[in-house]
Amino acid sequence: MERRRRPTLEMVAALAGVGRGTVSRVINGSDQVSPATREAVKRAIKELGYVPNRAARTLVTRRTDTVALVVSENNQKLFAEPFYAGIVLGVGVALSERGFQFVLATGRSGIEHERLGGYLAGQHVDGVLLLSLHRDDPLPQMLDEAGVPYVYGGRPLGVPEEQVSYVDIDNIGGGRQATQRLIETGHRRIATIAGPQDMVAGVERLQGYREALLAAGMEYDETLVSYGDFTYDSGVAAMRELLDRAPDVDAVFAASDLMGLAALRVLRASGRRVPEDVAVVGYDDSTVAEHAEPPMTSVNQPTELMGREMARLLVDRITGETTEPVRLVLETHLMVRESG
């Protein structure tokens, strides 16, 4: 049987009745082609089953049409925390709509950062989405030195806002909403399991908790504050610490659903009923909260939208549609369930 010849650019041009250069312009997304011609070329591509040569296209456009989503955590944390799933989904959808693909990379140690920096600066990608950064992360400086555009997922700590593009969640507002809910339901010994203080989400959710207490005329008491890193295990340790220091606690705001789930289980193991003895509010509004026992009240943050907006800002930067830094902050809302 004769093997079918692989379709070429010239074959597409002949079928569409246009020149080779016109086909290239359509493939590369140029706006210098009439709508009718563009449709004719697309029909020819579909009919022939033509697949553009990405390597050749890269030589012409000087782009790979690929971006990296870099999560500055280890793999275990990436796949354990529900927050990241929504981000990845939103990024993937938005990039696909613009004809881009992405690679997912993680790294937290110095060696991992060095390896990542070398890869990202090596013209393998057109830009980078940075997620879950800590205060000491070297990746932004590496990208600046290499001239690689990037967008932060979350407002960066210690960086002048006017110099960078980012998409963030209103973490202060979310922390405030959670704490106000506990105040409004009559609780007075309200503790919090805060997130890491080298990350903006951890800092700002704690700030929202504090602001809500002070606005209600209540004291901010350090003995009612313990810290975790958003993981389940850290939530277990933090809740036990709170009960040791303040056994009369009657409510807990946990800065992630996993830490909230940990609080629920530690409270149950200690003989306390939720919400009758101690109310609990989490943060993420993930399936973890929905399927907890009892179902957990939680702050909803639009992670899929966050991923979409991060991708949109980066592609706009890559294609030259925007050159100035853009900053977006997305709103949160409280999903009330049985735990508090």
UniProtKB/Swiss-Prot annotation:
Which residue ranges carry the DNA-binding annotation?
9-28
Stimuli inducing this protein = Constitutively expressed.
Every copy of the HTH lacI-type domain together lies at 1-61
What keywords were assigned to this record? Cytoplasm, DNA-binding, Repressor, Transcription, Transcription regulation
Q: Which GO terms describe its cellular component?
A: cytoplasm
Which Gene3D superfamilies does the record cross-reference, listed alphabetically? 3.40.50.2300, lambda repressor-like DNA-binding domains
Variant or mutagenesis effect after changing A55T:
Decreases binding to DNA and forms a less stable complex with the celE promoter in the presence of cellobiose
* Regulation (activators, inhibitors): Activity is controlled by cytoplasmic cellobiose levels. Binding of CelR to the celE promoter is inhibited specifically by low concentrations of cellobiose, the major end product of cellulases. Activity may also be regulated through post-translational modification.
Stored CDD domains: HTH_LacI (cd01392), PBP1_LacI_sugar_binding-like (cd06267)
Its name, as the record gives it, is HTH-type transcriptional regulator CelR
Provide the gene name from the record: celR
